[in-house]
Amino acid sequence: MSALTPASEVILRHREQFSSHHLLFAGDIQDTLATQIDAASVRVHTNQYHHWQSLIRTLGESAWFGLVAEKAFTQGCDTLIYYWPKSKQEARFQLRSLFSVLPKGINIFIVGENRSGVRSVDKLMDGMATFRKIDSARRCSLFYGQLEHEVQFEQDNWWNSYQVENVIVNTLPGVFSQDELDVGSRLLLSTFDKPLSGNLLDIACGAGVLAAVLGKKNPELALTLSDVNAAAIASSKATLKANKLEGHVVVSNVYSNIEDKFDWIISNPPFHEGLKTSLLATDDLIRQAPNHLKPGGKLRIVANAFLPYPDLLDKTFGTHEVIAQTGKFKVYQATKKF
């Protein structure tokens, strides 16, 4: 995690309000403010595994990773500090799930960059709480409100489904390509025009669409899917189940929990961390790929054409090839030497 974000710097302008309170941090947490702030107690819920890895070093069991927080974890908290994500639907999903395990009257602080859509917070509350803006700085806004009544949350009501070829894709809010297959993934899938065998790893799997489409076409292909996002993990499991496909779905920070070696590693890797551009995950994906490929195994990824991956592929593998491209995207392939 990086230095404090602008959103956290806005929170710190109000630090005196938190010193005697029991805080719950949640949402799009991009730094370690929760480990530094002065409060009676601090707990953190995150659905991002790599952020949880950073937080548990200091917070231990007071940091929780998962799709939704459990009531036993939030018990005793009297103040919620929520970081607004870039997806409004994800914010609605997360806030409703949090409100369902928090007491009526709890203090709620919602902070986010203005470009994230945080200023529409009141319109998305469905009467659960009323907010007023209490600060604006660093191109961020901070809102305060209180939970006005008990809230019910049914996860089954939040699923979305669509089809790609003959594959059913199930998604939750906050997962990449939640409503339809993105152009980059479609280009990547188009390059697999021959039968596949062996085992395949789909990194940053999102809703599992890449692995599911390839697994449906190649029944002998052994599938492993990984992501850092708890919503992506749940979505991928649901996608495999809907298509009667077997596969291992692993929460992993790139290769952190991946032990096997593969014939194929595929990915449409992210290049954003929240609203910021970040190439760290893809850098790790490429650099460490030879350690997780069998001799002759292939890494095949799709990326925006302007991103600086060719030199890194050559440095790591010795060479690479571009096997498909449009004006916006390129599909790169590199092979581990025997």
UniProtKB/Swiss-Prot annotation:
Cytoplasm recorded as keyword: yes
Top-level taxon: Bacteria
A single GO cellular-component term on record: cytoplasm
Location in or out of the cell: Cytoplasm
InterPro entries linked: DNA_methylase_N6_adenine_CS (IPR002052), Mtase_sm_N (IPR013675), rRNA_ssu_MeTfrase_C (IPR023543), RsmC/RlmG (IPR046977), SAM-dependent_MTases_sf (IPR029063), Small_mtfrase_dom (IPR007848)
Enzyme class (EC, first level): transferase
GO molecular function: 16S rRNA (guanine(1207)-N(2))-methyltransferase activity; nucleic acid binding
Pfam families found in the cross-reference section: MTS, MTS_N
SUBUNIT field: Monomer.
HAMAP family reported for this sequence: 16SrRNA_methyltr_C
Name used for this protein in its record: Ribosomal RNA small subunit methyltransferase C
Organism: Photorhabdus laumondii subsp. laumondii (strain DSM 15139 / CIP 105565 / TT01)
Gene that this polypeptide is encoded by: rsmC
